[in-house]
């Protein structure tokens, strides 16, 4: 059984991680555990590089907290220009898989607050009245009227980040021949 450490205690992220690992390895082969670790980046990461750094840092911290695990998973949401997205980073002892989620263009009413230094989740709570929205459907759920959720979008990106761990083509070593 794989011990999978989710570098988060956010239920929406843990559910996405669980669904992806179950899809790839089967429910009977996975045990998911969430741990509270720091991302090492601002609470609202700006830009792809800062956001991916946050996801990688989460994995690094989770490895320190649970070194005996088989997999460590970091998910970090960020904003780049006018879009929200997230980076997924998955590691085991030998490999790293990474993927970026789909992006959603945010309305100016949200971006204004972000430019003033507030988090997306705080702005969504202010405008919708839904408490702790980032642990639920998130901005994606609100703007798609529930057709998508933070969990469903992250689930797809996590499936892509898992590809190097199970697809045999990724295991082929490149050999060069000299003549």
From Swiss-Prot:
Q: Any idea which positions bind Mg(2+)?
A: 38, 68
**Enzyme's top EC category:** hydrolase
Please tell me where substrate binds in this chain.
8-13, 68-69
Tell me the GO BP annotations in alphabetical order.
nucleotide metabolic process; thiamine metabolic process
- Required cofactors, per record? Mg(2+); Mn(2+)
Q: Which InterPro entries match?
A: ITPase-like_fam (IPR029001), Non_canon_purine_NTPase (IPR002786), NTPase/PRRC1 (IPR026533), YjjX_NTPase (IPR050299)
Q: How is the cofactor bound?
A: Binds 1 divalent metal cation per subunit; can use either Mg(2+) or Mn(2+).
Q: Which GO terms describe its molecular function?
A: ITPase activity; metal ion binding; nucleotide binding; ribonucleoside triphosphate phosphatase activity
What PANTHER family does this protein map onto?
A: NON-CANONICAL PURINE NTP PHOSPHATASE_PRRC1 DOMAIN-CONTAINING PROTEIN, PTHR34699
**What do we know about how this protein assembles, alone or with others?**
Homodimer.
The entry's function note states: Phosphatase that hydrolyzes non-canonical purine nucleotides such as XTP and ITP to their respective diphosphate derivatives. Probably excludes non-canonical purines from DNA/RNA precursor pool, thus preventing their incorporation into DNA/RNA and avoiding chromosomal lesions.
Full protein name: Inosine/xanthosine triphosphatase
């Amino acid at each position: 059984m794989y011990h999978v450490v989710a570098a988060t205690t956010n239920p929406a992220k843990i559910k996405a991680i669980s669904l992806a690992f179950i899809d790839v390895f089967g429910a009977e082969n996975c045990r998911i555990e969430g741990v509270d670790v720091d991302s090492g980046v601002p609470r609202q990461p700006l830009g792809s590089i800062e956001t991916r750094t946050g996801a990688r840092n989460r994995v690094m911290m989770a490895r320190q907290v649970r070194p005996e695990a088989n997999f460590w998973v970091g998910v970090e949401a960020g904003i780049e220009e006018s879009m929200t997205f997230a980076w997924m980073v998955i590691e085991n002892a030998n490999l790293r898989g990474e993927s970026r989620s789909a992006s959603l263009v945010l309305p100016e009413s949200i971006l204004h607050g972000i430019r003033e230094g507030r988090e997306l989740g705080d702005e969504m709570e202010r405008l919708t009245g839904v408490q702790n929205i980032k642990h639920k459907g998130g901005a994606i759920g609100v703007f798609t009227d529930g057709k998508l959720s933070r969990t469903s979008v992250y689930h797809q990106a996590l499936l892509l980040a898992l590809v190097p761990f199970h697809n045999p083509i990724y295991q082929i070593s490149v050999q060069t021949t000299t003549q």
